[in-house]
Structure formats: structure tokens, C-alpha cells
A protein has these predicted regions:
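Phosphate-handling catalytic cores of nucleic-acid transaction enzymes
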Residues: 159-160
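Acidic/histidine-rich, metal-coordinating catalytic segments
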Residues: 137-146
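Feature for exported/extracytoplasmic and membrane-associated proteins, marking the mature portion
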Residues: 1-131, 150, 164-170, 176-236
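RTX-like calcium-binding, glycine/aspartate-rich low-complexity repeat tracts
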Residues: 236-250
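Glycine-rich, charge-dense phosphate/pyrophosphate-binding loop(s)
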Residues: 133-135
């Protein structure tokens, strides 16, 4: 959602507090499930709105023509407002990075997309710092796929495999690049880059070093054990925090 108040209004105006009993049929069981989702949405929307109401304004100005920045603007308020959600997912809408055509050079479409990403992340980090939440916030980027090395016939690049990602925040081990420069000559049979690290090594680092889980939990979550890249300082936020206790008591 783009606005906590709008989300609350949407749920609040389209719910019913009383229902007739669902029939004792397969369809009735499905109806009960839908109703349970509705009730959970009511509780969730009130919790989200309460967190947003505690912090009415951000400490930095986010450009409204940058969709990612607008999303991170909301996330920053909700974190500062005490919402105990551990993972926030924001995305760049549409197929912006799916640059099959007219990808451009240093001033082209892809360069502008990276500039928007840089601007949004920079403002978010500054905002968290000024709101006093930076010690508890880290972020990472990911994508469904990378891009092929060779240019296609439309001045773009097609779907590929390996791709870089960024990790950011106050308590990461920053200023480092993991891996070597991509080998643009020795490719796989389809012309794709050969990966150096499995992306799940980044998720393993997030679980072990940031959330403070153990190896068993990491293995269950990722369906096998992975060696974690050294990405986060030894200041894990853990699954339970003082903020959780504070939020639950409000």
C-alpha cells in the first residue's frame, strides 16, 4: 500500500462485523477462511495505522517522482512508529529493469534506474539515522533474474542468470565488494555469466548475523545449509527486541 491511512480506510469501509453462520459444506469451510482473512486484515490495518500515526513526518524529503523512494518513506515511518514487522518488502513497479530494448549507455534508461535506486536508498538511510532507527535497520536488493552479457537486436539485453546485489545500512560491513570482476568471455552455454556466490549465502548471512538465528533455523528456512558471507557486524537485531515488547504493550 502507498498510504497507511488509505489502507486502513479501504479495510475499514469494506468489512462486516457480523455474519450468518457458514453452511456445513466444503464451500462453507472456504467461506470461513475468507472471513478469517477479513478479520485479520482489520486487526492488521489498525496496527499499521497506529504505527504511522506515531510518526507523522519523515526527517528528510523524499522525491514523489521516485516510486521506490515513496515506498521507503512509508517504511521508515512505520519502523520509527514501532511496527514490529521484521521484514519489509518494497519493489520498483512494472518491468522497469526488464531492459529488452533501448537500455542505453551512461545516460540511458538503465543508468537512470540505478540513479533512482541510489537516491531512494541514500534518503532512506539518512531518514533512519535522524529518526533514531539506523542501528536496527539493514536493507538488501534482489531481483528475479540478471541480464545476458551480449546486446540483443533491440539495443537491450535479455534475461540472464548471475547479477549483483547491494547490502546497505549502518551496521553492515561496508565498503567491500564480494567476488571478482565478471568474466565476460567464459560464459555458460547460453551466453550467461557464471555465478560466483549463491544468493542464498546472502540470505544465510541475514538470518545468522542480523536476525541472530542458529544454523538449524537457517537450514530449515533455505532447505539446506549455506555458508554465510561476512556482511553484517556482530550486532544482530535478533527476533525479539525491546521494541517488540514496547509495541505489544501499546
Amino acid at each position: 500500500f502507498r498510504d497507511p491511512d488509505a489502507f486502513y480506510s479501504l479495510v475499514d469501509q469494506n468489512t462486516n462485523s457480523t455474519y450468518d453462520a457458514a453452511p456445513a459444506t466444503i464451500g462453507g469451510a472456504e467461506l470461513d477462511y475468507v472471513r478469517s482473512v477479513e478479520k485479520a486484515s482489520q486487526v492488521y490495518s489498525k496496527t499499521v495505522k497506529a504505527a504511522a500515526d506515531r510518526v507523522k513526518t519523515n526527517k528528510v524529503t523524499y522525491p514523489q517522482n521516485n516510486g521506490l523512494a515513496r515506498s521507503l518513506q512509508i517504511v521508515s515511518r512505520l519502523i520509527a512508529g514501532g511496527l514490529s514487522t521484521k521484514i519489509y518488502l518494497v519493489s520498483i513497479s512494472g518491468s522497469s529493469y526488464d531492459t529488452h530494448f533501448n537500455q542505453g549507455g551512461e545516460n540511458g534508461v538503465h543508468a537512470q534506474l540505478l540513479s533512482n535506486l541510489s537516491e531512494a536508498v541514500s534518503l532512506f538511510v539518512q531518514d533512519c539515522e535522524q529518526l533514531g532507527t539506523a542501528d536496527r535497520v539493514a536493507g538488501l536488493t534482489f531481483s528475479e533474474f540478471g541480464r545476458r552479457v551480449a546486446e540483443n537486436g533491440s539495443q537491450g539485453t535479455d534475461h540472464g542468470t548471475a547479477a549483483p546485489l547491494f547490502v546497505f545500512g549502518k551496521n553492515i560491513i561496508g565498503g567491500k565488494i564480494h567476488g571478482h570482476n565478471p568474466d565476460l568471455v567464459n560464459l555458460d552455454s547460453r551466453g550467461d555469466l557464471l555465478m560466483e556466490y549463491d544468493y542464498r549465502q546472502v540470505y544465510a548471512a541475514s538470518l545468522l548475523q542480523w536476525f541472530g538465528t542458529n544454523t538449524d533455523v537457517m537450514s530449515q528456512t533455505l532447505f539446506r545449509e549455506f555458508s554465510a558471507l561476512p556482511l553484517f557486524q556482530e550486532t544482530a537485531t535478533a527476533v525479539e527486541t525491546e521494541l517488540n515488547t514496547l509495541t505489544q504493550s501499546m
